[in-house]
Amino acid sequence: MATITADNNSNSHFEMEIEAESAILQQIQNKMAKHLESAAYVPPTEEEQKAIDAKSVFIGNVDFNSTIEEIEEHFKGCGQIVKTTIPKDKFTKKQKNFAYIEFDDSSSIENALVMNGSLFRSRPIVVTAKRTNIPGMGHGVRGSSRGTFGRGRGAARGAPGRQQTVVVKYVYVNGPNRGGRGGRGRRFNPY
């Protein structure tokens, strides 16, 4: 840090220290920028994702307190493991009760599928081949999952662009119906 002295050179000495510190900070920022550019995540292409999924398994009913190391230890006899993932809930940040294992080659999947039903932390686990996710929540190859006319939330029923008919069962002209059990009340006036 800069020291303040009572000399006439104190301002020039102080400025030299600031320049030296700013040069050091600039070097650090340049190193970090290079590191961030090289480490930027690029999602795999569709073909690359299919190749990864062909070498991966889904593991269900995993204990919530399981660790990646424990899962890898349980599946180490199946083949060389590239990556193990336990997804977490976006909001609570707690891990979910399933995991994915990516193997080095696709022949390891058959060995892993044999582990289906085995006990892991006193729970029977479900092991299946990982499927490739189809983005779009049901829009795409699988078709729409929101009814015949592709209704989403808040969309009107019926064919798109068609006028909707609204049926009103009760009309209260002079206020609400104050009678009980279908009674007309004192103020009922249908016209």
Swiss-Prot record:
One of its GO terms (cellular component) is nucleus. The keyword Zinc-finger does not apply. CDD domains: RRM_II_PABPs. Residues 136-160 are annotated as: Disordered. Residues 55-132 form the RRM domain. Keywords: RNA-binding. GO terms for molecular function: poly(A) binding. This is Putative RNA-binding protein EEED8.4. It comes from Caenorhabditis elegans.
